[in-house]
From Swiss-Prot:
Cofactor note as given: Binds 1 pyridoxal phosphate per subunit.
Amino-acid biosynthesis is among the record's keywords: yes
Record's protein name: Putative [LysW]-aminoadipate semialdehyde/glutamate semialdehyde transaminase
Compartments in which it is found: Cytoplasm
Binding site for pyridoxal 5'-phosphate: G97, T98, F124, D209, E210, V211, Q212, T267
Lineage: Archaea, Thermoproteota, Thermoprotei, Thermoproteales, Thermoproteaceae
Native source organism of the sequence: Pyrobaculum aerophilum (strain ATCC 51768 / DSM 7523 / JCM 9630 / CIP 104966 / NBRC 100827 / IM2)
GO molecular function ontology, one term from the record: identical protein binding
Gene encoding the protein: lysJ
Length: 383
């Protein structure tokens, strides 16, 4: 019998069911899901509105190539467009966040005809070869070098160095408004504004990677809206199809015809079932004011995480329901103890516990998370 290759740490838990902000293991233990598959299930496990849309679609048709129109795709773009600022008129459909980053880079290369990509310390953009090339951490890259050579890394959140960083050879600048994997590090408004101005001056495109930050999690539909800085292209993914695989590059209207037939493609992009889920998710986001809910309950969670009373805790970082608790010690030692107390979390960087719960997490859930985090930190202090 074959087996699934192992390249993830295993926690010895078999998850069998999920509903909204909770999951259950095969022993009946319930967990508050603040992991959500790295942010994918922001709209909740088995959300009834998304389940209904998927059930309806699977009885009609599943996979149709992009050469043909489908009602599912048309419904998606109609709903998704309501979430976009006016400048963004073109959506490039993909299957994952890393693919979305790849196509954004391809657009920039085709438009500018320049070689160099600018990225930043502690960045994470994916694990395919292009997005891996602009990811900072060597542990992800070392085994696969040489990667794309024309990458220049600058210091994140250092606006006064931007003019030297972005050159006449720069095709694009790729940045996360809040670094996720790198430590839940929000960009400063001054930094993003400096990138916007210098990219414009040098004829480079500004790309915001919103795969983790986007679709309501930070308290706005798109994190860049909180900064008042618009990119030329932004990527999205994770929660956009309610838990099904999707990636998007969203671009200015004038980039809509940048590729000739054959210059880009994707077998599964625009899958009808995924499109049905994404249309339902987009409608739900708007009708239930998901960003507003994320802002309000996120403030409650941030306050709770900042009130552990532990000397191991440094500060709470992030926005909305994308939060990190920075510690004075390595964070990965707390994942298993939190699981034992019914809380699923994840790490970001070396010393940050990351919390990415669904938007419907309740005040009672926040209290449980607070109690669990407080307990594991206090216990660690005593050892």
């Amino acid at each position: 019998m074959g087996r699934i290759a192992k390249y993830y740490r295993e926690y010895g838990i078999r998850i069998v069911k999920g509903f909204m902000q909770y999951v259950w293991d095969d022993k009946g233990q319930r967990y508050i899901d603040c992991n959500t598959n790295h942010g994918v299930v922001f709209l909740g496990h088995a959300n009834p509105k998304i389940v209904e849309a998927v059930k309806k679609q699977v009885e009609e048709i599943w996979a149709v190539p992009l050469n043909f129109a489908t009602p599912a795709r048309e419904r998606f773009i109609e709903e998704f467009s309501k979430l976009l600022p006016p400048k963004f008129g073109v959506v490039f459909l993909q299957n994952t966040g890393t693919e979305a980053v790849e196509v954004a880079i391809k657009i920039a290369k085709k438009v500018t005809r320049k070689p160099t990509i600018v990225a930043f310390t502690n960045s994470f953009h994916g694990r395919t070869m292009g997005s891996l090339s602009i990811t900072w951490n060597e542990k992800y890259k070392k085994a696969f070098e040489p990667l794309y050579p024309h990458v220049r890394f600058g210091k994140f959140n250092v606006p006064h160095e931007v003019d030297k960083l972005i050159g006449e050879d720069t095709c694009c600048v790729v940045v996360e408004p809040i670094q996720g994997e790198g430590g839940v590090n929000p960009a400063t408004p001054e930094f993003l504004k400096a990138l916007r101005e210098e990219a414009q001056r040098k004829g480079a495109l500004l790309i915001f990677d919103e795969v983790q930050t986007g679709f309501g999690r930070t308290g706005a539909v798109w994190a860049f809206q909180k900064y008042g800085v618009e990119p030329d292209i932004f990527t999205a993914g994770k929660p956009v199809a309610g838990g099904l695989p999707i990636g998007l590059a969203v671009a200015r209207e004038d980039f809509g015809d940048v590729f000739e037939p054959g210059e880009h493609g994707s077998t599964f992009a625009g899958n009808a079932v995924v499109m049905a889920a994404a249309a339902a998710a987009s409608r739900l986001l708007r009708e239930e004011d998901v960003p507003g809910r994320a802002e309000r309950i996120g403030a409650e969670l941030a306050k709770a995480l900042g009130d552990t009373g532990s000397r191991l805790a440094v500060r709470v970082k992030g926005m909305g329901l994308m939060l990190g608790l920075e510690l004075r010690v390595k964070a990965d030692q707390f994942i298993q103890p939190l699981l034992e107390r019914g809380v699923m979390a994840l790490t970001a960087g070396v010393n940050t516990l990351r919390f990415l719960p669904p938007y419907m997490i309740s005040k009672e859930d926040v209290e449980v998370v607070h109690a669990a985090v407080t307990e594991v930190l206090k216990k660690a202090e005593q050892q």
